[in-house]
Amino acid sequence: AECKVDVDSTDQMSFNTKEITIDKSCKTFTVNLTHSGSLPKNVMGHNWVLSKSADMAGIATDGMAAGIDKDYLKPGDSRVIAHTKIIGSGEKDSVTFDVSKLTAGESYEFFCSFPGHNSMMKGAVVLK
């Protein structure tokens, strides 16, 4: 099993994937996030955040208040399973997390917590 995925983000407020499948034989899983657009992070920054689907809206709302210096995430938010930092044009960041944090049958989503982005920039994370 390949225990990693490359995800690209764009100036059009999009990720290049809508679903990420994680093989349950993976002990850890790595997400490599890139930004192929031309806009800086304060204008069109993106991050990759993993949480239960039910927690996404609350994380995004609290993240807006936290601001860009905190990567639009409330510091120490226990609902966040994994996240990258906010990146802009030409930048990249990676995050590796323990697959044991995920439960089969639970609904997980990945999204960007930059204000207003999670309506379009989201997808499913499936453990199988």
Curated annotation (Swiss-Prot):
CDD domains referenced in this protein's UniProt entry, alphabetically: Azurin (cd13922)
InterPro entries: Azurin (IPR014068), BlueCu_1 (IPR000923), BlueCu_1_BS (IPR028871), Cu-binding_ET (IPR050845), Cupredoxin (IPR008972)
Gene Ontology terms, MF aspect: copper ion binding; electron transfer activity
Binding site for Cu cation: H46, C112, H117, M121
Main location: periplasm
Gene Ontology CC: periplasmic space
PROSITE patterns linked: COPPER_BLUE
Protein name as it appears in the record: Azurin
Organism of this sequence: Pseudomonas chlororaphis (Pseudomonas aureofaciens)
